[in-house]
Amino acid sequence: MPVKPSAQNNSPSKPTSKSVPVDSDSLVIGDAIYHLADHTPMMVQYLNMKVNYPQALLLYRMGDFYELFFEDAKRAAQILDITLTRRGTDKAGNTIAMAGVPFHAADSYMARLIAAGQTVVVCEQIDESATGTDNANNPSNAPTMGDKQKKDKSKSTAGTIMRREVVKTLTAGTITDDALIAPNHTPTVVAIDIETPKSNSKQPVQAAVSQMDLAAGTLTTQTISANQDDIESLQTQMLTVLARFAPSECIISEALSDSNGDISEEWLLWLRQHLNCPIIEVAANDFHREHASATLCQQFEVQRLDGLGISGAPLAQSSCAALIHYARQTQQRHVPQLNQLIVEYNDDYLIIDANSQQNLELFTPVSSNGTSLISVLNHCQTPMGRRLLVQQMKRPLRQHSRINLRLDAITSLLDTDKQSEQCSGNISLVTSLRETLNAIGDIERISSRIGLMSAKPRDLRKLADGIASSAQLTTLLTNAGISHEQAGLLPMLMQQLPAQLPAVQSVAELIERAIIVEPPAHIRDGGMLAAGYDAEFDRLTHLHDNIQVTLDEMVERARQESQLPSLKVGFNKVSGFYFELPKMQAKNAPAHFIRRQTLKSSERFITNELKTVETEYLSAQSLALTREKQLYNELLIRLGSHLAELQQLSAAIAQIDVLNNWAQLAITYNWQRPVMSNESKKSSILDNSLENSHSENGLNNNSQTSINIKEGRHVVVEAVLNPIHTHQNNPAKHSSHFVANDCVLGSYENPERLLMITGPNMGGKSTYMRQTALIVLLAHCGSFVPAARAHIGDIDRIFTRIGSADDLAGGKSTFMVEMIETANILNQATNKSLVLMDEVGRGTATTDGLAIAHACVNRLVEIGCLTLFATHYFELTKLAQNPKESSGSNDKFIRNVHVAASEIDGQLLLLHQIKDGAASSSFGLHVAKMAGIPIQVLNDAKRYLVDNLSIDNLKPDNESIDDDKNELAKSVKDKRQQTYDSNIEKSNIRNLDKKQKNIDIPQQNQLFSLQDELQAIDPDSLTPKQAHDLLYHLKEIISY
């Protein structure tokens, strides 16, 4: 089936440029027209290749360089900061721009181009003499990229253009070579297929998002849907899936951009606004839904799709099929390692959207010098383990049975570890596993490269060494009393280790027999096969390396057979190898000796055998290299037949590594096992109480959830306060200086579902909120948690509204961004969600902000979600103190807590303790002083504060409103807009006149001035006269 090469559309407002022939003598590539008659045969060859990849950068091999021409050269020169030169002009006088990179350093340049969002197409020279044998045995019929080839002068022989072929296409999501992949990065591609029914139809809008991890050999897909009038819901779901997939690039059908429909245009625009990766438009035929089933059946070698779980999901089929086509196109071959299909559903995982991931700093810190959660947690010893840990953190489990399976495995490791410590001189199991895992290479990516026929000799040696080390894992676990015949996660993983997989053992044995211990980095110069692997290769190598021995053996055999004791062998550039006999013995030469040269005292002969040895010697090196490459390709094919077993081994090692990493963190930081259960003490009484209470408000609160954390700690803050080298094999335990706090929501003892958190800035409100979310996240990942005890119920999502940032490019202010995030929470949260909201409403006028925050609290209580709500609006604390302050009996579901702080000698002491009740002050001026605000500014702030407090104190008692139920709403109105009846207003004015005699604003300014003067006086340095004058001066100020 013909396919269209992928093309990156870099201009959102402009359709992808098509490359088509204008006529038989011209080509259109992008916006340029090339007349073939104006170019040399080599440039015609280049243009005929380039026309298939109009948006990609074509690296065209010429001898020891990869060259780029025309617009490609200009773009690459700008990105790589290399010299832009020219390759003369065409016949029409147009300059041919050119830039190049050396082939031996091409990997680094390719990596930079890919990182810049470019697609790189590699075109290699095909040396017929060196690769003719290879091509017969190479399924891809493609040469190995990077092989050393002869200097290219555009022609391999007189009048003949050297043959070249595109061997692979490198894109951000399909690269598998470690030299091209950034550290701790997993290249993936997503395909999105959308089906929008007709406007008069009642069918829902559906979409499928599928992900391909070529290195891991997995396809993952999820189908989402929404009503036609609720497209925002579908987009929100899609963003959630994309946050979990974290794609390096995205492919869509060109039909989506070519469509004239408004819906398609809106979707395309929305994707470009929200996807932070290249969007590639591929042929609509790749997404063809009628052909998708056949493509998938062929790839997975099945007759029907029923066993794959997507038989009734046409969009999932088409998007997965498009990814398979894309992989085949970019790799220029079939991709047998792509052999696992995973179907995901939202209910499978605890959902954390992209904003919440960033607010919690899970993978990237907010500030450049910050610390992310993953950097503290990820001390896995293998590359596969490090990648798997990231995947598990992006996919926290919902099912408690699966979570407990992981927790049981960690418990087993820790229990065995404690037993080992009790035996003097024994290294703990966790430490031993770390040391063994550290010796295992990246089996996952090596296996993928074997499937793509691109694995290097050193890859194979690493694979063999890794298999040998993984066999030791079985020994360690067995010696610890864990058997593969037992139940549980660890025994199940042991069944996938070499001891239980004979095919994996045969792979290691084959590599040990075939590859030398220290092979070269590349196959281009040979020297990687071990002696004894192939008789013909050994003969050619022996012939070249031991020619003198071969000749000596031949001479000795001829002397014995022909009785010619004076027979000698020699060599010169004219005659080549020859036998030489003295004149007296020449007449006794055997009949098969052919006279070649007569000298004064001797004669020289050749034989067919000697001529054969000469020919083989002169070509032995070339023949040996050709044979070695052929054998190496055959070896990769043999190893490729065991890809499934190698992927099983890689997955098992990665899971053991992650479990052992969790165990090590539990030891190092004294983490405890959480209890994952929906049931708590006296749960039936609690459920009945909540049901009755919420039924009064008309709320549905079935299947409520709860959390109960005792002495919880923040993972990252604790690690920063107590730095430990957890990457070492024997990390030390630490004593924490972190102040631990409890967090209880929805339990029997504390049925409240919203904590109203007040207290000073810098007191630890945000830290307390984040630590609660991180503890819940770790528990759902199947890890022990930083707490003395933790009971976690069924949590479906974690939402956060923390921090502030604007979106200038999107035209959104800080407050607008805050409101968008708040709206998302209020629309998406359920009674099983954990919500963190920090200072909602602070980005606008105080009155508006307070009103919004008040309404948000009411809405969150109605939803019934577990909420941590931090605020500096102290008016909100009344919601928990008096049920009349809100629209319903919210006092049963809101509890005030505050961050403790003390003021000692004018200095603020932050205690970082969470205590019941509302805070008395935010201590804003104290924090400003700690930040270094100038003293003059602080004094001015104090005056302004006293002035406003004085005015507030002058109001009469009868200003209050009788209706307590509306008091909070009235208090948030601007004082300038309050109206009173005439009698109250007159009373206010009279009372104000009376009190202003005692409290005058100018007088208070003088008091501040007096305070400053007194602080500047040094009593010990004053003379009696100066002290006397000063007393009069102070009295004048007081009497003012």
Curated annotation (Swiss-Prot):
ATP binds at residues 759-766. PANTHER family: DNA MISMATCH REPAIR PROTEIN MSH1, MITOCHONDRIAL, DNA MISMATCH REPAIR PROTEIN MUTS FAMILY MEMBER. Keywords: ATP-binding, DNA damage, DNA repair, DNA-binding, Nucleotide-binding. Belongs to the DNA mismatch repair MutS family. GO terms for cellular component: cytosol. GO terms for biological process: mismatch repair. SUPFAM superfamilies: DNA repair protein MutS, domain I, DNA repair protein MutS, domain II, DNA repair protein MutS, domain III, P-loop containing nucleoside triphosphate hydrolases. Residues 1-10, 130-143 have a biased composition (Polar residues). Residues 1-22, 130-157 are annotated as: Disordered. It comes from the Bacteria. This protein is involved in the repair of mismatches in DNA. It is possible that it carries out the mismatch recognition step. This protein has a weak ATPase activity. Residues 11-22 have a biased composition (Low complexity). GO terms for molecular function: ATP binding; ATP-dependent DNA damage sensor activity; damaged DNA binding; mismatched DNA binding. HAMAP family: MutS (MF_00096). It holds the Pfam family MutS_I. This is DNA mismatch repair protein MutS. Gene3D superfamilies: 1.10.1420.10, 6.10.140.430, DNA repair protein MutS, domain I (3.40.1170.10), MutS, connector domain (3.30.420.110), P-loop containing nucleotide triphosphate hydrolases (3.40.50.300). The gene is mutS. SMART domains: MUTSac (SM00534), MUTSd (SM00533).
